[in-house]
Amino acid sequence: MKLTDIIKGTEYDLSLFSDKQIAELENRIVERKTNGGGKYYLTCLVRKKEIKLTPEEVVRQLYLLVLIEDYRYSTSKMELEYEVTFGREKKRADIVIFDKQDTTAPFIIVEVKKPKLKDGKEQLKSYCNATGAPIGVWSNGKSISYNHRNDPYYFEDLSIIPRADQLLSVFFSVRW
């Protein structure tokens, strides 16, 4: 099964991801026959259970590979569908990477959204504000946006995010 078949007919795009990452994900896909035809699944790297592949889930699973392979984050420091509370309202952040020292504090929040930039950026910022996470990432598979929450309600654009082995203070001192 090709990932392009799963996203066909949508506005999703996988141009942010390498051929190697796409092939790695495609090799993990299994088809389950149902009365209405076939459905495609894979075992999630973080949840360690089989999940149905939707276009948004394809982008999320590919971005997990980026976080693991390129940025060296451990799946043990990640949670998917992390609950974020706003008063009595509860929402779910797509991917959360927890702080190295304070393992219950969100460090990076990643939102994977439909292919319209504004659809998720404000939501991502609200999640960062609600949790105190200093880094936010938004992606739809074609575009990506990295943000640093400098002060509450003030975000600056970043060109990359820190790797797992970088302290935030060192990351910011080196890049300038």
Q: Model-predicted segments: where are they?
A:
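A short, conserved, highly charged catalytic patch centered on acidic carboxylates
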Residues: 1-135, 142-176
